[in-house]
Amino acid sequence: MTVVIGVLALQGAFIEHVRHVEKCIVENRDFYEKKLSVMTVKDKNQLAQCDALIIPGGESTAMSLIAERTGFYDDLYAFVHNPSKVTWGTCAGLIYISQQLSNEAKLVKTLNLLKVKVKRNAFGRQAQSSTRICDFSNFIPHCNDFPATFIRAPVIEEVLDPEHVQVLYKLDGKDNGGQELIVAAKQKNNILATSFHPELAENDIRFHDWFIREFVLKNYSK
């Protein structure tokens, strides 16, 4: 039985996610206990084939509008709210899966999944985007130097359900007026959210490999 990872391909950086998952499958296939495949997802028939879904960075407003206008929103909503499925939202994907937005909320009809309040464009304009070396070793073994790229990135301003949402990583406050910024979190063991773009870490598949091992395969084996 093949476990299928879908990458939402309505808009945004979906190809980069596909390539990273493909690289994981090629390089680690002997270490995964299940056969894996990856596919782009543009409609409900493709979505129905998936066990997990990555919602990429891009433009959350455009993503939301396309899903509504094509009649795809309800299918996406049902998928991500199914506890047997796995969802990962990166950057715009984090915005799209969140329950609340603290700014520009009327522009995006979210999937109302992740129980957090999110601020859009918290890092400013595109010219203020940056890559920061982050120590994720508290949740990814030996990953203490990951290049996390933030592009007009959102941040999690508030966790609305601390019982089920776990903060995985905060940026230190030295460049943010002393305020720590939540940029990675998970809800239960099947929903992951990141402000940054792991798919833009060239030739570095550690984050995607961890997602596959800790979310996709563990959830599938239940």
Swiss-Prot record:
Q: Which domain of life is it from?
A: Eukaryota
Identify which residues the record assigns to the active site. 91 (nucleophile), 197 (charge relay system), 199 (charge relay system)
Q: What is its EC number?
A: 4.3.3.6, 3.5.1.2
Which residues are involved in binding L-glutamine? 58-60, 120, 151-152
Per the record, the similarity remark reads:
Belongs to the glutaminase PdxT/SNO family.
Tell me what reaction this enzyme catalyses: aldehydo-D-ribose 5-phosphate + D-glyceraldehyde 3-phosphate + L-glutamine = pyridoxal 5'-phosphate + L-glutamate + phosphate + 3 H2O + H(+); L-glutamine + H2O = L-glutamate + NH4(+)
Species whose genome carries this gene:
Saccharomyces cerevisiae (strain ATCC 204508 / S288c)
Q: Its Gene Ontology biological processes? A: pyridoxal phosphate biosynthetic process; pyridoxine metabolic process
Q: Does the keyword Ribonucleoprotein apply?
A: no
The family database entries (SUPFAM superfamilies) matched by this protein are listed as: Class I glutamine amidotransferase-like
GO molecular function annotation? glutaminase activity; pyridoxal 5'-phosphate synthase (glutamine hydrolysing) activity
GO cellular component, alphabetical, reads:
cytosol; glutaminase complex
Described function: Catalyzes the hydrolysis of glutamine to glutamate and ammonia as part of the biosynthesis of pyridoxal 5'-phosphate. The resulting ammonia molecule is channeled to the active site of a SNZ isoform.
Name of the protein in its database record: Probable pyridoxal 5'-phosphate synthase subunit SNO3
Pfam families from the UniProt entry: SNO (PF01174)
Give the metabolic or biological pathway.
Answer: Cofactor biosynthesis; pyridoxal 5'-phosphate biosynthesis
InterPro entries (alphabetical):
Class_I_gatase-like (IPR029062), PdxT/SNO (IPR002161), PdxT/SNO_CS (IPR021196)
Q: What else is known?
A: Present with 195 molecules/cell in log phase SD medium.
- Keyword entries, A-Z: Glutamine amidotransferase, Hydrolase, Lyase, Pyridoxal phosphate
